[in-house]
């Protein structure tokens, strides 16, 4: 419970910082590489092309001196008036990633400004394999899509007759991937510099 609360506040503060920083002098191809937890966790962040405050987030964590896994997630901001938006938390939501039909887990839903922010998790991957895959694309494009499932195929982690616009007023966003390799290499180098002795 404490870990979940910590993640909630860290992500909340992180997203607020990204939204406020709209006047950054950095070019659009620049990735924001940040250190957390005394350097044990490194974040690689990119703001969205459609909704600026939506963030593509790649996370590396030093585990026993190794930084071999990367966690992929992204956020969507919604101002829809649906009072049940919180109920998608923990559910797998249908999406299109660059025309591939997939699911993204709505890991967290929390109030933000005049609406809600939803953090989606896409899983963890081996860093080199992830880079090889992502370098095939120039853009990381996400569209939250509708899905009609019969009762026969329904699972507890899915939403029956899910309609994207019931939950998201802007159901799509994209992030430019230019410079992603350099950003991940930099993040992994920083991650490997972490020493367990830094935290008593």
Predicted regions and their residues:
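N-terminal signal peptide c-region/cleavage motif recognized by signal peptidases
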Residues: 19-21
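Positively charged n-region of N-terminal signal peptides that target proteins for export
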Residues: 1-4
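Bacterial N-terminal signal peptides
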Residues: 8-17
């Amino acid at each position: 419970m404490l870990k979940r609360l910590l993640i909630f506040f860290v992500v909340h503060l992180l997203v607020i910082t990204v939204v406020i920083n709209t006047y950054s002098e950095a070019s659009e191809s620049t990735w924001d590489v940040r250190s957390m937890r005394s350097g044990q966790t490194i974040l690689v962040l990119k703001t969205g092309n459609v909704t600026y405050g939506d963030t593509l987030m790649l996370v590396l964590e030093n585990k026993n001196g190794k930084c071999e896994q990367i966690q992929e997630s992204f956020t969507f901001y919604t101002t829809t008036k649906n009072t049940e938006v919180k109920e998608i938390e923990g559910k797998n939501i249908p999406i299109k990633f660059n025309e591939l039909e997939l699911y993204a887990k709505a890991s967290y839903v929390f109030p933000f400004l005049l609406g809600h922010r939803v953090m989606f998790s896409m899983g963890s991957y081996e860093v080199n394999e992830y880079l090889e895959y992502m370098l095939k694309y120039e853009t990381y494009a996400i569209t939250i899509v509708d899905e009609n499932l019969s009762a026969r195929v329904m699972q507890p982690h899915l939403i029956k007759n899910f309609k994207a616009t019931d939950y998201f007023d802007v159901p799509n966003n994209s992030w430019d991937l230019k410079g992603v390799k350099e950003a991940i290499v930099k993040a992994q180098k920083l991650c490997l510099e972490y020493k367990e002795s830094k935290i008593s």
